[in-house]
Amino acid sequence: MSENALLALQRHFEDQFGHIEGLQPVSAKPSETAFNSDASEKEQSPTTSNEEEDAISDMEDKEDVSFGSKILRVSHQEVEKPTLSATVGRVSFLKKMPKLEDEEEILAKKREEQKLRKRSRQNDDGSDDDEVENLKNDLELQKLLRESHLLHEATSRTGQVQLVAEGKIRHKVVQQHIAQLGGKKETEKMPMAARRGMKKKQKHIEKVIENEARESGTVLAKKRKERKQFKKGFRPVTFSAPGKLVGGTLLLPKSMIPK
């Protein structure tokens, strides 16, 4: 209900039952004057009938019964919105801004970076030196393992422990190293008769082994056939063409020339 209706209801109630203590009057607004003027005009106008007045009074009685002696009032007050102070925004803006550094702070940071770089370089140099030394030790150990059988032979003869190859042993070590690198194996210096005897003995041993394997039924590895080597400039007799033709002249070996 509007305030004008409440004011009219309060007046009607006071006319019938009198004023009640503790009941606060309803404040009238400028629209109340218009309502009063309309009500006075309606009372003065002869068109209003008694039936309409009775109906209005019945409605007002019902409203009195429903509301009782309490009148509800609603006050509308404009609530001011809190405005943010400029200092809060300024502080948040300054927090987001990067911190300005002085020249002294910049120089201190540069010095710290230089110190860290020097330390890292020293550590790298130390690790490189260790790697070089370890590699050198590995090579020496490998060399000692390769020469161990020759050094053991020398120590067994002399009775003194030798870790460095000397004399004939050093020559053997060099030849062994050349053979490992893919070089041709040099034949040892000895008389031709002794060499032929060694080869003959080796062939005899191989034949004995083959005969024993054939009798026992064991299978040996297939032997590689050696090609016969001929001297340069001569051909074997099996070829159809005798000798060699060079520059229009026929060269014959001495074995083919009749005596």
Swiss-Prot record:
Keyword annotations from UniProtKB, A to Z: Phosphoprotein
Any Pfam family the entry gives: FSAF1
Region (Disordered): 22-68, 111-133, 181-202
Protein's GO biological process: maturation of SSU-rRNA from tricistronic rRNA transcript (SSU-rRNA, 5.8S rRNA, LSU-rRNA)
InterPro entries: FSAF1-like, Ribosomal_biogenesis_FAF1-like
Biased composition (Acidic residues): 50-63
Annotated positions of the Phosphoserine modification: 127
One GO cellular component term noted in the UniProt record for this chain: nucleolus
Name of this chain's protein: Uncharacterized protein C3F10.08c
Organism: Schizosaccharomyces pombe (strain 972 / ATCC 24843)
